Every structure is written in structure tokens, then in C-alpha cells.
Amino acid sequence: MAEVANNEQQGPQFNIQRVYTKDISFETPNSPAVFQKEWNPEVKLDLDTRSNKLSDDVYEVVLSLTVTAKNGEETAFLCEVQQAGIFAIAGLTEQQLAHSLGAYCPNVLFPYAREAIGSLVSRGTFPQLNLAPVNFDALFAQYVQQRQAAAADAPAEEANA
């Protein structure tokens, strides 16, 4: 009985069990010619997150970043990093858990992914690339709104069919 009371008093729990690089890639398809041109890049960042339950209260979250730099029409470099983490999360409501997996965990992983990308770009002898911080809370809120809007539209479409 005392154990149950202790567990209830502990409340929400969040532990990082492991942070690791799941996949990494760096390509310079137009080298060495790209190094001989004036450097005026257009940099595009794509990011995605996904999570899966490994066991009770243990989740893997993967943050995927793809950075593409084009110099004119040519791709200067393409860098992809999948930064992952294993998180033990307990004592949260379903909504809180979704927020943790969709925003908080990616926020923990982002500095690792940013450092990996910066290192790869530097090793490719390109000028330093500093990725700006990402507001994962805002991205998650936008995702939730889109899902709610899609759910609201679905019954209307069924009624019209």
C-alpha cells in the first residue's frame, strides 16, 4: 500500500535513457566544381519527428533533419541526420504524453542534430552553418490544429456524400 502511495506522489516522470545518432549522410554531388564558384547559397531545412513505443513507458523519438544548400541551380551539399533518443516517460495524461513526444523530446534532440550537421558541413570544407533554434512547441500546436481541422472536415464530407 505504501508503494502505491509513493508512486502516486512522484507524479510525472521523464528520464533520458539514451541519445544517439541513428542515421547520418553528407553528399557533395557537384564537388569539386562547387568550390570554384562564388558562394551565395540558398539553404533549405526540412525536419520531421516520429516516435514509437518500445515498452511500457519507454519511447524512441527520432528527429530527422535534412539540410540542402544550393548555389545557383547546383546542389552544393545535402546533409541528413536522424538523431534519436530513448525516453522513459510516465505519469502523464495522453495529451501531455503526445506533447512530450512531439515537442519536448525533439527539443532535447535538436542540439545534438544541429552539432552533427555543423560538423559535417565543416568537414566538407563549406562555410560554417549555424541552424537557428526551432520552436517545437509551436510546430506541435500547429500539427494539433491541423489534425483537429481535418477531423472537423471529415464528418462534413461524409454528410455531403
Curated annotation (Swiss-Prot):
Please provide the record's keywords in A-Z order.
Answer: Chaperone, Cytoplasm, Protein transport, Translocation, Transport
Q: Where in the cell is it found?
A: Cytoplasm
Example GO BP: protein tetramerization
GO: which molecular function terms? Answer: unfolded protein binding
Q: Which GO terms describe its cellular component?
A: cytoplasm
Listed InterPro entries: SecB (IPR003708), SecB-like_sf (IPR035958)
A Pfam family cross-referenced in the UniProt record is SecB
Specify the superkingdom: Bacteria
Primary location class: cytoplasm
Q: What does this protein do?
A: One of the proteins required for the normal export of preproteins out of the cell cytoplasm. It is a molecular chaperone that binds to a subset of precursor proteins, maintaining them in a translocation-competent state. It also specifically binds to its receptor SecA.
Provide the family line: Belongs to the SecB family.
Q: How does it assemble?
A: Homotetramer, a dimer of dimers. One homotetramer interacts with 1 SecA dimer.
Stated name of the protein: Protein-export protein SecB
The organism of origin for this protein: Shewanella halifaxensis (strain HAW-EB4)
